[in-house]
Amino acid sequence: MKPMNSRILSQLINLTTQAGEIIMNLRDNSTNYSIKADNTPLTLADKASHELIVSKLQKLTPNIPILSEESSHIPFSTRKSWNEYWLIDPLDGTRDFIDGSPDFCISIALIRGHYPSFGLIYSPFNKVHYYRLENSPSLKLVNKTTFEILTTKPKRWEKIVVGRYSTNNKGLKEHLKHKTNFETFKHGSALKFCLIAEGIYHYYPKFGRCSEWDTAAGVCILEGAGGKVIDLNNNTLKYNSTKDIISPAFRAIA
């Protein structure tokens, strides 16, 4: 596909808004869920959002493959030849959604040559889109009307954001032992990348299990706001390069 154009972007914003409405309408059924093979929950909202997004994307860009959390069975023997594909989490933060927290989102990235060239994250609860086009600054769109350019705000005294369910992770605890002058805050889902891009927080260390669809759009958005996401060897995250669809431990930095 050629670089993302305004027509496709507009349709993606409308599509994620529609999926978000479905998710919000199913909040009362959030406790009705099953457990997948990887021990993560799956709700009716996950499935409904997945079905809508995939069906619309197949019509919008029929020549681009799609990898969604709910279709992750696609073998690497097929995926490894992809130079470009959509990487989707139709409902990121499912545990937060089940627990009644607003920290859930829809995450869509376009991967080109193992790296995200476009990222879009939508918060259905707040009706806020965060997105970045290739080689462009990251933007925040509130209620489909008000735009704001996102810029990180690095500080020596840091506000560190961590996953709501990861505070007991041994790697995270050990990592924070070596930092000074900081305060921690808990949030769920890929919205943490967006909150750093907005300048609300300054640092997000992740040491627990994390899949590639959990990070791709957020990485793209944070980089477009002036931040970076690197693994523990100071390398940028690479996508669809191994059989496993797992992101390594990383640090998201303003």
Stretches with model-predicted labels:
Residues 149-172, 179-187:
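Short loop->beta-strand "edge-of-pocket" segments that line small-molecule binding or catalytic clefts
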Residues 76-139:
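DPxDG-like acidic metal-binding loop motif
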Residues 1-91, 174-177, 235:
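N-terminal subdomain of lithium-sensitive/metallo-dependent phosphomonoesterases centered on the IMPase/IPPase/PAP
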